[in-house]
Amino acid sequence: MNIEEKYLLWLNHPNMDQDLKEELVSMDEKQKEDAFYVDAQFGTAGMRNILGAGTNRLNVYTIRKATMGLAIVLNKLNKSNGVAIAYDNRYKSVEFAQQSAKILASYGIKSYVYDSLRTTPQLSYTVRHLHCDAGIMITASHNGKEYNGYKIYDENGCQLTPEKVGEVIDAINNIKQYFVEEPKLTLQQEKLINTVDKSVDEDYINEVLTVQLNPQLSKDNFKLVYTPQHGTSYKAIKALFDKVGYDVVYVKEQCNPDPAFSNTLCPNPEDPRAYVLALEYAKQCDADIVLTTDPDGDRLGLAVKHDGQYVLLSGNQTGAIIIDYVFSQNKLKGTLPENAVMFNTVVTSDLGERIAQNYGVSVEKTLTGFKYIGDKIEQHNIKKDKTFVFGYEESYGYLIKDFVRDKDGNQSCLLIAECANYYKKKSMTMIDALNQLYQKYGTYRESQKSLTLTGADGKEKMQKMIESFRNNILSEFAGEKVVKYQDFGLRITIENGEKKELTGFDKSDVLKYFLADGSWIAIRPSGTEPKFKFYFCIKGDSQNDVLAKEKKYYQFVDELVK
């Protein structure tokens, strides 16, 4: 069917939801194209899209169809342990969770649904804790209020890898019904929908408490500000900090769950606007650090008071500090395993890797997306050859202990608070700790530059851009020689004029250029947002040196994409 045929099918559907019908009636040609040119697709972190009418939107029909695909796969595999379901604070989240449970029940599959919003890491934990076959998380993470999303987890509490997602997509594509209606359940089927017991909350909180390395540290003379950005994390974080005894000031205007994110300029911890109100609180109460989680509670942002000013740390910087703290403390206590392994992604800074290697910890790289890290953890657990000690990615996601198989903002909050308190007791800040790492391992600066390209035109342009870069391999970047090039789509490495196969990764549209000065640049179209991204890991002799290089590299990129 073409776009107009799809549109008319939706418009004339007799059972179409009234709000979706009104949206369809008001669409112009451009809006029709964007809503129907493709079906909603699974990207880096599940299916994430703008709420609304159409095949390329998140609505009850696309949610039901996705869940039907999952149900078909589970029944084909004779799975009988059910599916855990949680949801965040967004518009339609409760309805999407309920509809997912009903579809599963219509296929004879049990579900365990939370009665109110919970964080993404707790959903991952719940799948494992209740020995479920799968999990569904209704969330769009840090995206704007117009979005929602649908993430599927496997029996290990890990987001589905492309191979497993492919099975669900194949099942969806074979569904005969164009519109999946709400099923009319029998009494027996209704009994398959269960509410998750409150005891799971306490079990999860108690597990998170085990990430502390120095719980005996005095909490005196240490204060922090925390905001959940109107999302899911407030109850869990408050429970943790109350148990541990930190002096916490909560940003009250942002503690209530709110799908409109009314009192935050941006709910994304990567964006400085997310900290505006929290920093006002911090200045008033003279807090040592500011912590913020994103709406679904898997990612964490940090600001540190240093020399009288609050400094925002990037995910790479925070990751480096945590790595050094965790590994040094474990080494001191004799609890760092001999076969320790750390995971990070191909667009994460080299600094963390250098620190890990100094402690004898091996490092394995994955593609972007914590699903790959979760999968690696499981592979090594099966082989019993390596012991997980840390996993992280540049986009503010960290995992300290693997009772969760996704990034965990709750674990991160607790450990970073302890880390900051530890350094304060030594008359240091986390910035001082970071500067010591630069002195030891070299100065690094990591940053990102993105082009926002929306709709069908934007998607086509992004594909043309990546193909253009792929077909015209750069031999130098802003005057610096490219000494190695990796194409994760074609799975090749070119070094010293020699082409080799790039193994150990699924195919992905990522290109990476390694420069003679130890820096690298990676480019990829985002799998969760309409953005074409450039990642920079810049190595130099000093802060002035890396800042000058960054300016030069940015100008070069601007010229490339004109």
Regions found by a protein language model. Give the residues of each.
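Phosphate-binding and adjacent anionic-ligand microenvironments
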Residues: K283, A287-I289, Q309, Q329, ...
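An N-terminal, well-structured beta->alpha segment
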Residues: N2-S100, Y107, E190-F222, T232
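Gly/Ser/Thr-enriched, mixed-charge loops and adjacent short helices
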Residues: N15, Q31-A40, N148-V276, A282
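Short acidic, glycine/serine/threonine-rich loops at helix termini
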Residues: V94-Q99, S124-V127, E146-I152, V180, ...
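Conserved phosphate/anionic-ligand binding catalytic regions in large, soluble enzymes, centered on
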Residues: F36-N56, S141, P228-L240, P295, ...
